[in-house]
Design a protein with these regions (language model features):
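A short, flexible loop at the N-terminus of ABC-type nucleotide-binding domains that lies
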Residues: 1-4, 10-23, 73
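Conserved ABC transporter NBD signature motif
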Residues: 60-70, 76
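Conserved ABC ATPase "signature" region
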Residues: 101, 105, 112-130
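Conserved catalytic motifs of ABC-family nucleotide-binding domains
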Residues: 155
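Catalytic Walker B motif of ABC-type/P-loop ATPase nucleotide-binding domains
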Residues: 159-163
Length: 247
């Protein structure tokens, strides 16, 4: 379970304070798939980075499986797999296999465990023939597949994805959606941000809407549709902004 308790994050820029996330609270049960919606600059990435322990909250706390992320960072990091859009975390001069071996070692996997995981992930994503190619020389879609494999190499319980289908072709994007379905069946907790409303509707049990750092909705899609008496998610999102609603 992930508990977000009254979390805020402020940045200082040219003597001004930027309130990226403001007093956000919600809970994500274990094994749930959550879609994070909001316009550019809404605070989605900042919130994901705080859950991932990359950033610390200015105020409030984040609890993952009963452990405070600010106090047990390394233990929490081993539970989490992270992919932030085009920030693949890969090394261009290394092959796909060398990249995956490197990250497997960082997470404490044995050589045998690493090889088994790499073989399984390569088969899963159809990239076996690319394992010995340098990452800098493969297509964007294949690079994203390697990045997703890197995210899953240590078999994390919590998976955080920021705009994961951005720049992917239709085949690769559909592969990602299938992956989410499989990970959900495995009991993984998944939080991903997206601008594609249909993608969120197809994959998520729960959605979180953020506008200018404020939480404007957290709950199931069905509850939201019943409240708004429409299933047009774009319309609902804009209507809540216009009405100035907060959760």
């Amino acid at each position: 379970m992930i508990e977000i308790n009254n979390v805020s994050r402020t940045f200082k820029e040219k003597k001004q304070e930027i309130h990226a996330v403001q007093n956000v609270s919600f809970t994500i049960p274990t094994g749930e798939v959550v879609g994070l919606l909001g316009e550019n600059g809404a605070g989605k990435t900042t919130l994901l980075r705080m859950i991932a322990t990359i950033l610390e909250p200015t105020k409030g706390e984040i609890i993952i499986d009963g452990k405070n992320t600010s106090q047990q960072t390394m233990e929490i990091k081993r539970k989490i797999g992270v992919l932030f859009g085009s920030e693949t975390g890969l090394y261009d001069r290394l092959t796909a296999k060398e990249n995956l071996q490197y990250f497997a070692k960082l997470y404490g996997l044995s050589k045998h465990e690493s090889n088994v995981r790499i073989e399984n992930l390569a088969k899963r994503f159809g990239m076996k023939e690319y394992l010995d190619r340098k990452v800098g020389g493969v297509s964007k879609g294949m690079r994203q597949k390697v990045a997703i494999a890197r995210t899953l190499i240590h078999n994390p319980d919590v998976i955080l994805l920021d705009e994961p289908t951005t720049g992917l072709d239709i085949t690769s994007a559909n592969m990602f959606r299938e992956l989410i379905h499989h990970l959900r069946k495995e009991g993984k907790t998944i939080v991903f941000s997206s601008h594609i409303m249909e993608e969120v509707e197809q994959l998520c049990q729960t959605i979180v809407m953020i506008h200018k750092g404020n939480l404007i909705y957290h709950g199931s899609l069905q509850e939201l549709y019943q409240q708004e008496e429409t299933e047009n998610l774009n319309y609902i999102f804009m209507s809540r902004i216009v009405r100035g609603e907060t959760a």
